[in-house]
């Protein structure tokens, strides 16, 4: 029996079951006759327009409300003080002070906005559908805008004018539930949390720092060069922009023209919160063009630029100012280059032309083109005329890519910086920094989001001091790499000339000729041009400082460099959406899966199923001959199933579902029993009224209006519960639920009683209705009847039904209804998808078809029916999405992990560890070990199936990936891999689940960050996080279809072995029986001795090599064994491992993978024998080794760099445990350290209870880390927090001591 036998019904969870709907009888004919589909299709299109209209209203509201927000000067000044201190010192306390300063301002703004009357209606039905006799806020605003002659919608808008907008909004009167999700999304716009799309974030996180930087520049400029700006001319030219209503410094309310000094008063930042204020401020900085005038009216930046040229002082450019970001949802907030969905070829070429014309016409604040600006910037950078301490590289994959590109080694820059920073922080303790020093080093290296160019320059200079001349990595080579950027612009310009001819060819609207094979050359030309532009952006990306990340670091930047660079970068960044839209257009599928919601003239369709609500929600469920049906009543005939109709039409045929629900007992019971019309019937006593008035029956409830809240009284609570019990027994409907309540004295709170009511306040019964009556109302168009359908209900269905079918059937099963596990929920939805491709028979019935799966022993199949490719898109389809609750009566899963750990502590001796690794030769590999670490089972998940047929998914996915990779590069149609992946994963998850139950196993994965998961293997094989998520969700509610319906593991008693999934970040290191252990040192570790390579030999120079080899205790030739031995203590190389002393040997051979010039530089493999390599090397340099004595001194006495380069290479070969041969499945592990019997582990000769290859070794050692956790769980003291963190030294000690 499984130890998890009682881990059932632990918590409830919700699922949405999805089915097709098949119209019955005259249903489809009647629907079309009434135009119901057309009505809902129009409503779906109008909904998109309505969202645009509501966004316009949000713009208006934001503009209006922010014009009256006033952030106190004290708060602004405090923010400023901390901000500038933080630029000088990255102190943790200052970071906290800065966060506090931000949060205080955000809170003040948020409270002001939320207190406004208009805000209260922004997200409820009153925005669109006001109370009777009143006009909604939205309608009123539209009418006022029309009366005031305000033009809300531009010429190219989807909405013609305000009259159309009014008609659209009025059409949603009574349909406001449509906007529930949209309103939730728009609430983020007003959030005070760190959400970049919030107006408060835009003010405090984005624009306030920019304003403060500009203020500081203005004050410095006035001090250094007061004559640079013509103040009087600006005041004259930009009088409109300098006019403000309020001077927040003096609190003067008087519309007047401000001086520049007043513009930069910190209190007057309040004038630049909304878009009109931002536009004014930006114009003051950048100037403006005025119709009819030949010259531009200069802003501050132009004056700085002119003065800098006049006195020939480029240093003044640092005073140029940055414009503020546009306010969220403003017309100008979105990028200037807006790309809609591309509908035809004309859209493609027109959009491309617009993009390149805009790039060519774009001018920076210096009135220069993008090419000219970047050329000058990078020329100055190459000449190192800029302050390198204030220019940064992004410290991510961009930096390692740059290192590879410039130095042909991805690790050079990172290694140089690490060594340099370590030397700065721990000069006396380089090999073994203290914990505090390690934290500081990490903060300035791998954890730093940006590295200054000065740091990189100094690091490389220091790095080169210890490297041979031909191994030098010069900083200048990095700068030269960017100086070549103008050449890329020239190449783009050449290819852009071809675009004109292509545009002419494809300018006709409505055509999709670019999707045809004949357009392949033109598609390639388009792609080449976009690729070049995209590559340019990627090259520049390393300099780009993300706005949100800058807030965390408060980088001290070269303001002029970033001012003009970011202008260019953001303009070029429009290539990303353009590229994606055009690629998606070219590679689009021939069919569309777009669907829209059906309402059948009822805004509350299927909102609930309660019998009393049937006339309102007009949706009813039926069962007939083990098939399920959904009926939708015509809105005008919504009483065709009232009690009278049911009574008159009883008979054989259909069973109608009668649904009764007592929802929200805490609100429903008092609402009913104390309502004005019912209070006499339920007749509460004076004592009960007293209890209710003062809320003494609740701990935190509210008293009735006009009464004071008295302290909770348990006796009053129980009196109130007895009143509720008596009243329920009187209620005409609720008395039939058959409530079985606990003894009143057992309740300790009113909430306990409410929970009992809700758990029993759900009831499904059935009424028989004659088939003739149903047929009659369908034929008359009073009822639209659909069969609820999936493949399990097909006459051709074979095998077991899927879980959604089992769940659906369980809803109506008497065994479920006796003690409810599955509950049917409201909020169901119906959808419609139109046919998008013609129906064409791919394989006629009764004709043999070759099986695609080469692993299938049956080579051909014959079907009794025609096969049609993508058949589901060749027909109009109806769909039904229905939510349900599983484990309806169960409570939450607050301490689920603790419960699991307590069980494992009690049953530790019966538990196995199932560890899963993501392999290089395996999609996934598992190892099952017992409580002593012995391997019980191990195998690959490459091949899944049964004895009749197994499928090699590794090969199938690899083949598809290869095709997809080629198609992606050439913009060809991409084969769908998603369904195969999910089919594969569902089978893997099922196999894991079986092992878990059979062996009482916990599951262990490596805790890899998302980037590592995405980057370690080919992208298309990145099934692992999906595997983890699918496994978690499977173990949320684990049903084995073979198990009996009401037995453990069956539909009614599913295992629950993981906590509900939210996000991987929130999940931490455990979710139920799944644990995450640190990644690293799992596949490249000796499974017998526990040896891991932490030497990492690397040739840099003769002196460094001499120093390195001198640290070995002994280097000699073993005369008895015939191989070389290197003895050392890790402590001499830095304290990195639990066991210090090791002897590694040149035993055996290794496989080296390399680019073979004789094979067109493709990957190839050669076998090398380290012992022979060393023998030859030592002989070549006349070093005697045959005596068996230590030769360390002779080695360190050499001075030839070729000698040490080769010796280092051979030592790396000896340390190479993992060996794989290109193009084959060969992937073995060989250890350089002998065990106590003098044997070297080699997975090719390993017994079945040891890892069989390198991937198996990875899974095995993940399992050993899991075994460590199991030991901690077993020994954990009650009440003490379980430590799930495994440090490397703890892990090394564990594995190295296991076999000793």
Swiss-Prot record:
Changing residue 843 to A: Decreased pre-crRNA processing in vitro, binds RNA, no change in DNA cleavage. The record marks 833 as: Binds crRNA. The active site is at residues 843, 852, 869, 917, 1006, 1255. It catalyses: Endonucleolytic cleavage to 5'-phosphodinucleotide and 5'-phosphooligonucleotide end-products; RNA = a 5'-hydroxy-ribonucleotide + n nucleoside-2',3'-cyclophosphates. Changing residue 925 to A: Decreased cleavage of target strand in presence of Ca(2+), wild-type cleavage of DNA in presence of Mg(2+). Residues 326-329, 538-541 are annotated as: Binds crRNA in crRNA-target DNA heteroduplex. The record marks 613 as: Binds DNA protospacer adjacent motif (PAM). Residues 340-591 are annotated as: Recognition domain 2. Residues 1-24 are annotated as: Wedge region 1. Changing residue 873 to A: Decreased pre-crRNA processing in vitro, no pre-crRNA processing in E.coli, binds RNA, no change in DNA cleavage. The record marks 671 as: Binds PAM. The keyword DNA-binding applies. Residues 663-762 are annotated as: PAM-interacting domain (PI). InterPro entries: Cas12a, Cas12a_NUC, Cas12a_PI, Cas12a_REC1, Cas12a_REC2, RuvC_1. Residues 592-662 are annotated as: Wedge region 2. Residues 25-339 are annotated as: Recognition domain 1. Changing residue 1006 to A: Loss of target and non-target strand DNA cleavage, no change in DNA-binding or pre-crRNA processing. One of its GO terms (molecular function) is DNA binding. Residues 893-953 are annotated as: RuvC-I. Signal peptide: none annotated. One of its GO terms (biological process) is defense response to virus. Its EC number is 3.1.21.1, 4.6.1.22. Has bilobed structure, with the REC lobe (residues 25-591) connected to the NUC lobe (662-1300) by a discontinuous wedge domain. The REC lobe binds the (pre-)crRNA and the crRNA-target DNA heteroduplex. The heteroduplex as well as part of the DNA downstream of the heteroduplex is protected in the central cavity formed by the NUC and REC lobes, which also positions target and non-target DNA for cleavage after domain rearrangement. CRISPR (clustered regularly interspaced short palindromic repeat), is an adaptive immune system that provides protection against mobile genetic elements (viruses, transposable elements and conjugative plasmids). CRISPR clusters contain sequences complementary to antecedent mobile elements and target invading nucleic acids. CRISPR clusters are transcribed and processed into CRISPR RNA (crRNA). Has endonuclease activity on pre-crRNA and dsDNA, using different active sites. This is CRISPR-associated endonuclease Cas12a.
């Amino acid at each position: 029996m499984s130890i998890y036998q009682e881990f059932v019904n632990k918590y409830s969870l919700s699922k949405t079951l999805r089915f097709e709907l098949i119209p019955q009888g005259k249903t489809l004919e009647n629907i079309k006759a009434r135009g119901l589909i057309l009505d809902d299709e129009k409503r779906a299109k109008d909904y998109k327009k309505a969202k645009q209209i509501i966004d316009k209203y949000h713009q208006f509201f934001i503009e209006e409300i922010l014009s009256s927000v006033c952030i106190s000067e004290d708060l602004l000044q405090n923010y400023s003080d901390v901000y500038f201190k933080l630029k000088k010192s990255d102190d943790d306390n200052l970071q906290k002070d800065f966060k506090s300063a931000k949060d205080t301002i955000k809170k003040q703004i948020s409270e002001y906005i939320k207190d406004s009357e208009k805000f209260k209606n922004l997200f409820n039905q009153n925005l669109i559908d006001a109370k009777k006799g009143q006009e909604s806020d939205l309608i009123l605003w539209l009418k006022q805008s029309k009366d005031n002659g305000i033009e809300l919608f531009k010429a190219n808008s989807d909405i013609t004018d305000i009259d159309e907008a009014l008609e659209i909004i009025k059409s949603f009167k009574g349909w406001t539930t449509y906007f529930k999700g949209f309103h939730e999304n728009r609430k983020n716009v007003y959030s005070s949390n760190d959400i970049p799309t919030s107006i408060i974030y835009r003010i405090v996180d984005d624009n306030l720092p920019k304003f403060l930087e500009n203020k500081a520049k203005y004050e410095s400029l006035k001090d250094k060069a007061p004559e640079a700006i013509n103040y009087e001319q600006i005041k004259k030219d930009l009088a409109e922009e300098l006019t403000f209503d309020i001077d927040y410094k003096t609190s003067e309310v008087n519309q007047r023209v401000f001086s520049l000094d007043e513009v930069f008063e910190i209190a007057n930042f309040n004038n630049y919160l909304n878009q009109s204020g931002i536009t004014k401020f930006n114009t003051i900085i950048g100037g403006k063009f005025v119709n009819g005038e030949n010259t531009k009216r200069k802003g501050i930046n132009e004056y700085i630029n002119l003065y800098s040229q006049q006195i020939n002082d480029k240093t003044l450019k640092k005073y140029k100012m940055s414009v503020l970001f546009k306010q969220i949802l403003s017309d100008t907030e979105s990028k200037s280059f807006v790309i809609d969905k591309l509908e035809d070829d004309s859209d493609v070429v027109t959009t491309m032309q617009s993009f390149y014309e805009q790039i060519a016409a774009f001018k920076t604040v210096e009135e220069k083109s993008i090419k000219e600006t970047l050329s000058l910037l990078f020329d100055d950078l190459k000449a190192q005329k800029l302050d390198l301490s204030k220019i940064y590289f992004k410290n991510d994959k961009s930096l390692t890519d740059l290192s590879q590109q410039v130095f042909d080694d991805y690790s050079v820059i990172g290694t140089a910086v690490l060594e340099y920073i370590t030397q700065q922080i721990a000069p006396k303790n380089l090999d073994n920094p203290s914990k505090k020093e390690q934290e500081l080093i990490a903060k300035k290296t791998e954890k730093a989001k940006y590295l200054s160019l000065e740091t990189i320059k100094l690091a490389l200079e220091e790095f080169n001091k210890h490297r041979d001349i031909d191994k030098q990595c010069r900083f200048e080579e990095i700068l030269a790499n960017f100086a070549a950027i103008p050449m890329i612009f020239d190449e783009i310009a050449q290819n852009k000339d071809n675009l004109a001819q292509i545009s002419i060819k494809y300018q006709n609207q409505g055509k999709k000729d670019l999707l045809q094979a004949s357009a392949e050359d033109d598609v390639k030309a388009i792609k080449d041009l976009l690729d070049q532009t995209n590559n340019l952006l990627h090259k520049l990306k390393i300099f780009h400082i993300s706005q949100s990340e800058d807030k965390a670091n408060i980088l001290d930047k070269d303001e002029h460099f970033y001012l003009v660079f970011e202008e260019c970068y953001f303009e070029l960044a429009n290539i990303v959406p353009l590229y994606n839209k055009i690629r998606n257009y070219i590679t689009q599928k021939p069919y569309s899966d777009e669907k829209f919601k059906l309402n059948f003239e009822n805004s509350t369709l299927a909102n609930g199923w309660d019998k009393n609500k049937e006339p309102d929600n007009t949706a009813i469920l039926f069962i007939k001959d083990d098939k399920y049906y959904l009926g939708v009543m015509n809105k005008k005939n919504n009483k065709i199933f009232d009690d009278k109709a049911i009574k008159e039409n009883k008979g054989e045929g259909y069973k109608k579902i009668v649904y009764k629900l007592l929802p929200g007992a805490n609100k429903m019971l008092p609402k009913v029993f104390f309502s004005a019309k019912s209070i006499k019937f339920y007749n509460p006593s004076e004592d009960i009224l007293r209890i209710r008035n003062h809320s003494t029956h609740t701990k935190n409830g509210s008293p009735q209006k006009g009464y004071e809240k008295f302290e909770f009284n348990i006796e009053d609570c129980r009196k109130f519960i007895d009143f509720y019990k008596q009243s329920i027994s009187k209620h005409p409907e609720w008395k039939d639920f058959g409530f079985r309540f606990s003894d009143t004295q057992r309740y300790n709170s009113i909430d306990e009683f409410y929970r009992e009511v809700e758990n029993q306040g759900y009831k499904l019964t059935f009424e028989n209705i004659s088939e003739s009556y149903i047929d009659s109302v369908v034929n008359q168009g009073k009822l639209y009847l659909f069969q609820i359908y999936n493949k399990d209900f097909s006459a051709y269905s074979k095998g077991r039904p899927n879980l959604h079918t089992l769940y659906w059937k369980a809803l109506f099963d008497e065994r479920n209804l006796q003690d409810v596990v599955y509950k049917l929920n409201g909020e169901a939805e119906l959808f419609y998808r139109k046919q998008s491709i013609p129906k064409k028979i791919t394989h006629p019935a009764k004709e043999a078809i070759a099986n695609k799966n080469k692993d299938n022993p049956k080579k051909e199949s014959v079907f009794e029916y025609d096969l049609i490719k993508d058949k589901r898109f060749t027909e109009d389809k109806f769909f039904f999405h229905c939510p349900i609750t599983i484990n309806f009566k169960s409570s939450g899963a607050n301490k689920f992990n603790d419960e699991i750990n307590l069980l494992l502590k009690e049953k530790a001796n019966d538990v196995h560890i199932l560890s899963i690794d993501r392999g290089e030769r395996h999609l996934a590999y598992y190892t099952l070990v017992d409580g002593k670490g012995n391997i019980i089972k191990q195998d690959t998940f490459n091949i899944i199936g049964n004895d009749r047929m197994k499928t090699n998914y590794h090969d199938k996915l690899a083949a598809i990936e290869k095709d997809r990779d080629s198609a992606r590069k050439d913009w060809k149609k991409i084969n769908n891999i998603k369904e195969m992946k999910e089919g594969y994963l569902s089978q893997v998850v099922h196999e894991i689940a079986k092992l878990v139950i059979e062996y009482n196993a916990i599951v262990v994965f490596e805790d890899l960050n998302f980037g590592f998961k995405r980057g370690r293997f080919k992208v298309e094989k990145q099934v692992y996080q999906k595997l983890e998520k699918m496994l978690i969700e499977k173990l949320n509610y684990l049903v084995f279809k073979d198990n009996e319906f009401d037995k453990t593991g069956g539909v009614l008693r599913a295992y629950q072995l993981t906590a509900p999934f939210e996000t991987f970040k929130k999940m931490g290191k455990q979710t139920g029986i799944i644990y995450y252990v640190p990644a690293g040192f799992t596949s490249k570790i000796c499974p017998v001795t526990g040896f891991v390579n932490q030497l990492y030999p690397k040739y840099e120079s003769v002196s460094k090599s001499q120093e390195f080899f001198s640290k070995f205790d002994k280097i000699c030739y073993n005369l008895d064994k015939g191989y070389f031995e290197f003895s050392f203590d890790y402590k001499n190389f830095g304290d990195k491992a639990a066991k210090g002393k090791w002897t590694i040997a040149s035993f055996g051979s290794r496989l080296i993978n390399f680019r073979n010039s004789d094979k067109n530089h493709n990957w190839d493999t050669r076998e090398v024998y380290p012992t022979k390599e060393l023998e030859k090397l030592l002989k070549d340099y006349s070093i005697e080794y045959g005596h068996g004595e230590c030769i360390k001194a002779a080695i360190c006495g050499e001075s030839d760099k070729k000698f040490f380069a080769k010796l280092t290479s051979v030592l790396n070969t000896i340390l190479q445990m993992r060996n794989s041969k290109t193009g084959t499945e060969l992937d073995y592990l060989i250890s350089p350290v002998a065990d106590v019997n003098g044997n070297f582990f080699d997975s090719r000769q390993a017994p079945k209870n040891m890892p069989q290859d390198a991937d198996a070794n990875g899974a095995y050692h993940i399992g050993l880390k899991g075994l460590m956790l199991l030991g901690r769980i077993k020994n954990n003291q009650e009440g003490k927090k379980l430590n799930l963190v495994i440090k490397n030294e703890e892990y090394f000690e564990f594995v190295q001591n296991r076999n000793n």
